[in-house]
Amino acid sequence: MEVHHPEPHLILSYHNVLSSNEADKLVAAAQPRMVQASIGHGKEVSEMRVSRNCWIKDFESGHVDKLSPRFNWITKYQTSRPLDIHGEGKEEEYEHLQVANYGIGGHYQSHQDPMFVYKEPDFIVYSVQEKKIPPYPTGDRLATFMMYLSDVAKGGSTAFPRLGVAIKPQKGSAVFWHNLKRSGRSDMFMLHGGCPVVLGSKWVANKWIRETANMFHSPCGDHIDV
């Protein structure tokens, strides 16, 4: 484990999270499904990023199902569908694995991973469309667990400009950080982006950890700025 930035804006790297073969299998599973990155539930091509991506459900790939317990153990959070006594998962409590590919020139402008600007008892404000919508049953993106599925010859670092941190992709490693404060508000210091790929191809897998499935793993703070 490597600490890139200390608390309260903790950024960690875990090395050898995936073997080279496991990373290659995720890339192979994703390649036939890849589409141009978009926003707004796939209805609008994103101008913030130049990449392709896809979503893989746990039960669609035995490979992902086998990896999920490992992700849970590393992050200490529920990252995949929690199973009930009948062996069935509550899909509304988690977010599927996203695989993304950035070719030469591919990048992702600085952004925040939380989906909501702020929350009220009866509605939330969605950060992209600035519209009031009912609360998501999954809750917001509490934390991010991003795995590098390839090395990159040049460029492609993950940068946190407000913290002065830049992490070079290393195949099989993963980066972990919290997006929300204990109060549930977005941590604006966690602004980050994917630097342009200068040479090579960058593959990553993102597992966004949601609030609802982890409400007992991440106690709330008693102050709005916590």
Question: Where in this protein do the model-derived segments appear?
Answer:
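Fe(II)/2-oxoglutarate oxygenase catalytic core
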Residues: 1-176, 180-226
